[in-house]
Amino acid sequence: MKIETLPAEFEPARPILSRIEEAGFEAYFVGGCVRDTILNLPIHDIDIATSAYPAEIKQIFSRTVDTGIEHGTVMILDHGTGYETTTFRTESGYQDFRRPDSVTFVRSLKEDLQRRDFTINALALKEDGTVVDLFDGLGDLKRHLIKAVGDPAERFHEDALRMMRAARFAAKLGFQIEPGTLAGMSQNAALLEKIAVERIQVEFEKLLLGKAVQNGLAAMLDTKLYLHCPGLKEGGQGLQYLAQQPLTLNNATQAWGALAICLGLDKNQLRPFLKGWKLSNGLITAVSRAVPLVEKLTTKTAGASDLYQAGQQAVADAVVIANSLGGQVDPQAVQAAYQALPIKESGELALNGGDLIKAGVKPGPAMGKALTTLTKQVVEGQLANDYQTLLKAAGELLKA
């Protein structure tokens, strides 16, 4: 197969391949950029593999940086944008089921490609657009199959995270996992516990945001991979329910929020679950704001205070989550209700703690409680957001 017109993203990198070839070595675009080009998907990273050893690359190009030279990776800066080239290599000894104990540089493209995870990622692309396919990756793209290169068990023992990647690609591309590869995932699912939670989390989040979430979740359920993920040992039914929903999730907050609701987590379980996945504090806060609002939006019981406490972004996320789980929430109506709030954050209240101190009120819990009550009354339209009105109301509250 030959791609007559390469996407524009490749153009700045093509001179690098030409220079390497002119020096007598092989060089190819490899991995996801080749797969996504063939599938007409957006291209993210341009990866280059070469038969030239790192020292030889540094002789060919004048401006280089050793970004991972022990693994054969050198960044070339000669053409402005930095591009990483990695020497063809074989790997051996995966004691942690993630990283090789040793790397050996080789001159053979086949030896390099056969260590890769899936056939659809083991494609190479020449500078002239010719696709090199040594493991029928093109056939598997046509068949919409995710298939391990060689023996699935070997690939998963080399890197147990590949099992999550298989499920993630199923969700992202809408592909099925080849039966032998799926069986290999079932047999080796427990190895996932050897992998850092943060790495599993990245793949799982991408899965939840895929266009075919159902495919990815089905793979996790069929292989029992989910049993080896944080907080999901009792989550089989919740994942099945999630897989049946008309999901249209757009960001991480929505993804984790929808998952939490389908798992039936209550307010006391939510934060520990999210922390177990090693999510950032900011994301945990965002999910914790959105989730309580979802049920209220779905049951039409969300009031002004609920919208105020959630904040604009959480309100928007909650609407998407609700509708992704089969709700009938009108986004425009909810947004209009939010915009109609008299104030949208505490700083907009016409009276603050400093004003009360000037008026002779002693700082303390009573003052804080009074300001909270005033805020609620303004949000709910019971009081005008006016300095004199609020000062008078505060005085009455503090006398009580």
Swiss-Prot record:
InterPro entries assigned to the protein according to its UniProt record, in alphabetical order: Bact_CCA-adding_enz_type3_sf, CCA-adding_enz_C, CCA-adding_enz_firmicutes, NT_sf, PolA_pol_head_dom, PolyA_RNA-bd
CDD domains, A to Z: NT_ClassII-CCAase
Binding residue positions for CTP: 32, 35, 116, 159, 162, 165, 168
Gene Ontology terms: biological process: RNA repair; tRNA 3'-terminal CCA addition
Catalytic reaction(s) noted: a tRNA precursor + 2 CTP + ATP = a tRNA with a 3' CCA end + 3 diphosphate; a tRNA with a 3' CCA end + 2 CTP + ATP = a tRNA with a 3' CCACCA end + 3 diphosphate
Enzyme Commission designation: 2.7.7.72
Binding site for Mg(2+): 45, 47
Domain of life: Bacteria
Annotated residues for binding of ATP: 32, 35, 116, 159, 162, 165, 168
The entry's keywords: ATP-binding, Magnesium, Metal-binding, Nucleotide-binding, Nucleotidyltransferase, RNA repair, RNA-binding, Transferase, tRNA processing
Enzyme kind, highest EC tier: transferase
GO molecular function, one term: magnesium ion binding
Requisite cofactors: Mg(2+)
Function of the protein: Catalyzes the addition and repair of the essential 3'-terminal CCA sequence in tRNAs without using a nucleic acid template. Adds these three nucleotides in the order of C, C, and A to the tRNA nucleotide-73, using CTP and ATP as substrates and producing inorganic pyrophosphate. tRNA 3'-terminal CCA addition is required both for tRNA processing and repair. Also involved in tRNA surveillance by mediating tandem CCA addition to generate a CCACCA at the 3' terminus of unstable tRNAs. While stable tRNAs receive only 3'-terminal CCA, unstable tRNAs are marked with CCACCA and rapidly degraded.
Matching HAMAP family: CCA_bact_type3
Subunit architecture: Homodimer.
Other facts noted in the record for this chain: A single active site specifically recognizes both ATP and CTP and is responsible for their addition.
Family membership: Belongs to the tRNA nucleotidyltransferase/poly(A) polymerase family. Bacterial CCA-adding enzyme type 3 subfamily.
PANTHER family: CCA TRNA NUCLEOTIDYLTRANSFERASE 1, MITOCHONDRIAL
Protein name: CCA-adding enzyme
Species: Limosilactobacillus fermentum (strain NBRC 3956 / LMG 18251) (Lactobacillus fermentum)
Upper lineage: Bacteria, Bacillati, Bacillota, Bacilli, Lactobacillales
Gene: cca
